[in-house]
Amino acid sequence: MIAALESCHRVEFYSAVDFNAEYAESAREIVSKKFNNIIARAAVLDFSNKKEISTINLSEDHSNLIICLGGTIFCAGNEDYIDKVVENIANLLKAGEYFIFGADISDSEQALRPAYFTDLSYQLMLNAMHGLKQALGDSNSNFDPTAFEPVFRWNERSTTVELLLRATRSQNIIIDNTECCIIKDVLYNILNSRKTSINEIKLRLSKYKLEIVNIYETKDVFGNKFALLKTKKI
């Protein structure tokens, strides 16, 4: 973001928007310290919430640009969520204004596996199981959240990376006074990451009068493909 702002001309206002207040404030502070000529502010916002979006007042006197970094919109597994976010962002823009965002367009299992099937992803999944044990309380003190091994699966039909845990032994847990069984060797889906083709993105954007004008593609060390898309409201 700093590099992008340094290459821009006549930028007067910058809003750091995030669902997490701490992240938004950190971004605002970085920009404020780096650029004396830019007025920066932090805003906590859920772009899928139409009511929250309606509170944003973009400049009527200047051209506006919305940049979405971090987690990519089109990786969400929920189609309704993607539509809500894209529609709400499109409604903020006037004709001729721009929206720039990143997209993970990888479609090779061979490249995706080493990028996603890591010790870090395994630890994240185990953290979810530790969180489950904590949420369930004292009645499940014997539940072992580490009795799982990681499994990677590429769902070609839905173009989704699925990270799962396979139970290494059977266990019983109690949820709302109901005994449930975790069965040995059964797979439990924990994390998903959707991959979307450029054509699918283009079709979805067109519903909200957003047109792709530039695509910048790159690859990581594993061969996974990423794209930065510049779109214009028409």
Where are these predicted regions, by residue range?
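Alpha/beta-hydrolase-fold catalytic nucleophile elbow
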Residues: 17, 69, 100-103
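Short amphipathic alpha-helix with an adjacent loop that forms part of the alpha/beta core around
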Residues: 50-61
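Substrate-binding/catalytic lobe of Class I Rossmann-like enzymes that use SAM or dcSAM, i.e.
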Residues: 105, 112-211
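Class I SAM-dependent methyltransferase SAM/SAH-binding core
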Residues: 2-50
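Conserved beta-strand signature within the Rossmann-like core of class I S-adenosyl-L-methionine
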Residues: 91-108
